[in-house]
Every structure is written in C-alpha cells, then in structure tokens.
Amino acid sequence: MTSVGPPHSTRLYYRPTPLLREVVAACSALARPFRPTPWAVNRHLQLALLAFADGHDLPLLYDRCNVLRLGDGGCVSLEWSGLDADPATPTVVVLPTVCGDGQSMRRLVRDLRAHLGWRVVVCNRRGHGTLPLTTPRFSVLGSVADLRVQLAEIRRQVPGSPLYGVGVSAGSGLLVRALGEDGDATPFTAAIASCPGYDTTRAFGRVHRPYDRYLTRMLKAHFLERHAYVLRGHAGYAEGLTSRTVEEFQDRCHPLAGFASVADYHAATNPMAVAERIRVPLLVLNAADDPVCVVENVLEHLGLVDVVAESLIALTSRGSHCAFFEGTRRPGSWAHRVIAQYLRAVDDALRPRPRTSGRPEERAAAGTHPST
C-alpha cells in the first residue's frame, strides 16, 4: 500500500475475531475520522502544539512515588495516581517516551483518570525524571528486567487489580518486547502501543533529518551530559557524545546498556524479534505523517495482525508523533480518547457486567482488512 486514503481517514487492520468486533464497535473515536485541529493540521504544527501543551500544563501531583532499588545498585520508580480507587479497579501501567517520566506523561494520566476513573501508575526508567543514575548503566529503549521488578511491585501493591499496559513511542517498544518475552505469562490483560517504531534495527535510521538532529541532541543531554558524573570514562560515553544521528547514538551506547556488541544489544531489545509471541489483545496507534516513527515502519509490519490474533492497527493520515490534537478552542488528544475507549471496551468484553441493553452491534468484516 502506498497511500492511506483520503484526508483524515483512519484505517483499521485486524482479524475480525469476536473480541475485536465487539471492541471496534464500542470505540466511537475509531469509527469517526480523525480531524486534526484546523490551525495545526500538518505534522510540524501538531508537534508545535504538543510542545506548547507540555510546556504550559500544570504539573501533576501524584499520590505517591516509590523508588525501587535494583540488584545491581540502579534504581527505577513508580508514580501513582488514583490510589484511592477500589482494590478491584483496573490499573493502567504507563511506559513513557524515550526521555519521558511522570510529568511528561501528565496529560495522558489526567485524561485516563478523567475518562476511566481507573488507577494509573507511570514506570520511570533509570535516570529519568528526578531519578539519579546510580550506576553506569542505561538503555535507550529501557530494560525488560527492570520493568519486571516494577511490575512485581505493582502486583504486590494491587494484587486484585487487572493490569493494562500503555507504551508511548520508545515506551511502546519496551512494552511489546516484554509482552513477547513473557507470552502467556504476562501480567497484562491487554496493551496499547502508541506511535511505535516497530523494528528498532531500522526505525531510527528513518527519522526525518531535522527531527533526527533534534532528538540526537536531546538524547545526548538527557542520557550522557546529565549523568556525566557516573558515565564519564566508561565505554560508550565518549562514542555517544560524538553521535550525529539517533541511530548512531543507540548503537554507540550499547556498552552502557550492558552488551558486548551492537548485535547482542539488538537481539535483546528489538520488540519485533519476539512480537509473534504476544498472547493478549494489542492496539497499535500510528500516524502516516509521523516524522519520527515513519509510515514505512507500519506498512512493513501490517502482517502483525496475522500472527497476533487479537491485534488491531489503527493508522491515521494525520496526527504526527504522539500529538493527535483535535478540536479548535481547547484542543485535546484524539489518541487519549481512543486509548481510554479501547481499554474500557476490552475490560467490558473480558470481564462481562450486567447490561440493560443488548450487545453492541458488530461490524461485518471478513479477513484482514482496512476500514476507513
């Protein structure tokens, strides 16, 4: 496929299983075309609006922050919102962007709390947010082993709560990798990957040039310059500082992630290497005009819906990278509405509750198909 259809269309790719028919029928935001904010239609203006919103939203005061010490001396943290929810209320586990933390995810957290009323916990990786980097170890894509420590603590604190995963950009890669590695043993009931790059051995080499330069500078500042006190002198530090692209940065910093070679690093972190082992419902959101996680990545992996039975790929023509702003006077995130509706629909489908009306009308479908 070389185009994504008429302006503002949303294409849905999925196998019409009973679960996905019910879920798609229940997600009104997916049924209607995504119409970007009229004065922020293109990818650049969407990202400008995202930067403005991130810079002007009030900080979110989380209910609690748990700092977890890891076996090698490193530390990660959990930031909780909605701790007063009933013990059986579902919990959304948020995995942030490449440099993200609880504050950068605050609009998503607020929207999930407003739309769902569920508990939300953000998993902060090593050296992110206010966390110090206490050992010379970090990974651009995060660590599944570290995530398992966080999930074990979440399960300890809310043992009766169903867990739903939401990964954003780089966080989606970590989430998909964990889902694939764990297979049937995953603690997640369902998951959402928002703006993923898919194959991380290729995705970073496709980032549009102006954004590639910007992200490379950001990665150097966030991972290396900020933590020079612990990283300076270690293999990968000087090499990372001389990187000119995101792809170079990721590859040159592999020793700081604990790997002897670039090949070993990719074998242990690439989400698509294990994606076929995912056993829970998965929604994937992408925009065709995304300059960071480009549409070619999506089109090369539409076959995901054939190997992951309950997977659904939603591809919009507009929305840019992690933006998806709609509305005029007070623009909000279409993606956040979709995420909330999907989580509610899957939870309703997998944990049936008494209803006063019949089952939602199912959309007729046959085979893997696009729907606009």
PLM segments and residue spans:
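Active-site nucleophile elbow and catalytic-triad environment of alpha/beta-hydrolase enzymes
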Residues: 252-274
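Short, surface-exposed "cap/lid" segments of acyl-processing enzymes
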Residues: 81-134, 153
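Short beta-strand/loop motif that positions the catalytic acidic residue
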Residues: 278, 284-286
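N-terminal cap/lid segment of alpha/beta-hydrolase-fold proteins
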Residues: 43-84, 325
